[in-house]
Design a protein with these regions (language model features):
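Extracytoplasmic ligand-binding site segments that recognize negatively charged/polar headgroups
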Residues: 69, 88-216, 221-224
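Early extracytoplasmic/lumenal segment of secretory-pathway proteins
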Residues: 32-96
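A bilobed periplasmic-binding-protein/Venus flytrap-type ligand-binding module shared by bacterial periplasmic
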Residues: 145-151, 186-189, 268-279, 298-299
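N-terminal secretory signal peptides and thylakoid transit peptides that target proteins
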Residues: 2-19
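A ligand-binding cleft/hinge motif common to bilobed small-molecule-binding domains
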Residues: 93-96, 235-254
């Protein structure tokens, strides 16, 4: 979900920094001068929890912000992880990093706050390699069904509503190959939407090709989807993320979102321990600090991300559906998905 990931963060935080941002150290360091080096997305090392961490540890924290998943991987690969202690990326990228030997396992015994993880995030298979944990779930969101509440007084229960000819030319679908094929796989009931068989691919192609005549358009990017929805009397949209709803409301649309019974695609960003970490103890201390419920509260209230520890704050924000999402994993053949998606759009 590389392109959508970039668009999502740009929409939430404005233009992303592509250069290193070094955060000021305390005026007086403690006896042991220590530095934590983090490679992450904007919004994941905020003053609300960063300042407390620096105060508690006396450490300097250097943060580098990545502008895309590819840039993040290149920065890690360039030094075999030696330039960073911590990195953060979503669940679909674990095999890539593990295969490149850029990560090391996390010792759960060093994370007393691990108990704070909400149940749906405590057992995410994608962060495990055998019995070893390689990721700590931190922030999440979804690609939900967005609808006009004037057309739907009650939320649609199934994605099949986007094949209802009654709403022909009043529906939008995101132009993203991997996300589209994955959702199509969920809708047709594939056993694993990220490891499709030839039969699964055939069913997805038939399903999505049959839908094309009902769509007003495919759209690319958060703003494109919001503008097309608001300007054309759209009733239903395969959304690029939760923030499209408040953006539509600002334009006068009575919009809401739902997660249909077939589930929806979910992204789950995690903290990972670099294979080249110089201060492993300090890196684990950061992870443990990020498991504090106060951090989850700030993450959700400031940036509208779902958090993995503070259930009450998620509930207040309406983010109560983590257990109804299919967390992104590495696809069986990304190039095949792109080719199929192009066939569907051309068909």
């Amino acid at each position: 979900m590389i392109l959508t990931t970039v668009d999502r963060r740009r929409f939430l935080t404005g233009s992303l920094a592509t250069a290193a941002a070094t955060l000021a150290a305390p005026a007086v360091l403690r006896a042991q001068d220590r530095t934590l080096r983090i490679l992450t997305w904007e919004g994941y090392a905020e003053p609300e929890w960063l300042d407390k961490f620096k105060s508690d540890t006396g450490a300097t924290v250097n943060v580098v912000y990545a502008g895309s998943a590819d840039e993040m991987f290149a920065k890690m690969q360039g030094s075999q992880g030696a330039d960073f202690d911590l990195v953060s990326f979503d669940t679909s990228l674990f095999p890539r990093y593990v295969d490149a030997k850029l990560l090391q396992p996390i010792d759960p015994a060093k994370l007393p706050n691990l108990k704070n993880l909400a149940p749906e995030f405590a057992t995410v298979k994608a962060v495990m390699q055998g019995e070893e944990r390689y990721g700590l779930p931190f922030a999440w969101g979804s690609l939900p069904l967005v609808y006009d509440t004037e057309a739907f007084p009650t939320p649609p229960e199934s994605w099949e509503v986007m094949w209802d000819e009654k709403f022909a030319q009043q529906m939008l679908w995101q132009d993203d190959a991997n996300n589209s094929i994955t959702l199509g796989a969920l809708i047709v009931g594939a056993a694993n939407p990220y490891k499709l068989t030839d039969d699964d691919f055939a069913k997805v192609k038939e399903k999505l090709t049959g839908q094309k005549k009902f769509l007003l358009s495919y759209y690319a990017g958060f703003d494109d989807g919001v503008n097309l929805f608001a300007q054309n009397g759209i009733k239903l949209m395969y959304s690029m993320g939760e923030p499209q709803v408040p953006a539509l409301v600002k334009k006068g649309v009575k919009a809401a979102l739902t997660i249909p019974k077939e589930k929806a695609v979910g992204w789950l960003d995690c903290w990972e321990l670099s294979a080249g970490a110089k201060d492993k103890e300090l890196a684990l201390a950061w992870m443990n600090a990020c498991l504090d419920g106060a951090v989850g509260k700030a993450l959700t209230e400031k940036h509208n991300y779902g958090n993995t520890t503070n259930v009450d704050v998620n509930k207040a924000a309406g983010l109560t559906y983590g257990d109804k999402l299919s967390w992104l994993e590495t696809a069986e053949n990304y190039e095949k998905r792109v080719a199929l998606w192009n066939e569907i759009k051309a068909g």
